[in-house]
Amino acid sequence: MNTQSTPSPQFYLTAPAACPYLPREMERKVFTHLVGPRAAEMNDILTQGGFRRSQNIAYRPACEACRACISVRILAQEFEPSRSMKRVQSTNSDIIATEFPAQPSSEQYSLFRRYLDYRHQQGGMSDMTVLDYAIMVEDTHVNTRIIEYRRREEGSGLEQRPKGELLAAALTDVMSDGLSMVYSYFNPDLQDRSLGTFMILDHIRRTKALGLPHVYLGYWVKGSRKMDYKTRFQPQEHLTPRGWERFDPADAGEDHSR
């Protein structure tokens, strides 16, 4: 009897580059391609092992002199929103969230462009074109969805794509043990809505409804202001050399009780 074995993934190492989070540090990444019939399975395994997905690439930091990037996942079934998070939910009660297959639109790109121009003018994504955005959304071999968040208007919910202004969107992988937030963006003019927080809360709600345990938020870097928000969602686990361990919010040097 002839049997065919699936080739093991090949891993590669990037050249050193300036770290986007910590000054004077250099970053390197180890990566592999997520293609073929086992792409979804490999994405699950690698994400659970601290990798992140970007298009058809799974990567994780492999820096020579630094271990500051820590993988974070929320324990969705145990999560209870704080008072401030409940206020965010109330503020955004006029938003309707709709899940679609991972397909880009010009409306999405327009909002994405506004977000980049406001938040990441000097970042590596700052010059992304509409084609780059389309590739970011569509180039996936796993179960990827895009969730649109729109201001609710009369008639919303009666059509396949609800009416109302697009305020935010999230590119999300559906995994065997939860949801992984690949990339999210929002209208930067609506700071009072805390749309980034609202999208994470919505992903926790969706994960609970699916009966799954985890929402993956990517990497947290202690001391990086860009990353501080991630430790507000408790309880959560951090990936350590000993495996996933529950994180004590006091270690972040912040008060998360409000």
UniProtKB/Swiss-Prot annotation:
UniProt keyword annotation of Disulfide bond present: no
Reactions performed catalytically: N-terminal L-glutamyl-[protein] + L-leucyl-tRNA(Leu) = N-terminal L-leucyl-L-glutamyl-[protein] + tRNA(Leu) + H(+); N-terminal L-aspartyl-[protein] + L-leucyl-tRNA(Leu) = N-terminal L-leucyl-L-aspartyl-[protein] + tRNA(Leu) + H(+)
Coiled-coil spans in chain: none
InterPro entries: Acyl_CoA_acyltransferase (IPR016181), Asp_Glu_LeuTrfase (IPR017138), N-end_Aminoacyl_Trfase (IPR030700), N-end_Aminoacyl_Trfase_C (IPR007472), N-end_Aminoacyl_Trfase_N (IPR007471)
EC top class, as a word: transferase
Keyword Transferase (UniProt): yes
E.C. number(s) listed in UniProt: 2.3.2.29
One Pfam entry name: ATE_C
Keywords, alphabetical: Acyltransferase, Cytoplasm, Transferase
Main location (coarse class): cytoplasm
Location(s) in or outside the cell: Cytoplasm
GO cellular component, one term: cytoplasm
GO MF assignments: arginyl-tRNA--protein transferase activity; leucyl-tRNA--protein transferase activity
GO biological process assignments: ubiquitin-dependent protein catabolic process via the N-end rule pathway
Primary role: Functions in the N-end rule pathway of protein degradation where it conjugates Leu from its aminoacyl-tRNA to the N-termini of proteins containing an N-terminal aspartate or glutamate.
Family affiliation: Belongs to the R-transferase family. Bpt subfamily.
Protein name per the record: Aspartate/glutamate leucyltransferase
Source species: Rhizobium rhizogenes (strain K84 / ATCC BAA-868) (Agrobacterium radiobacter)
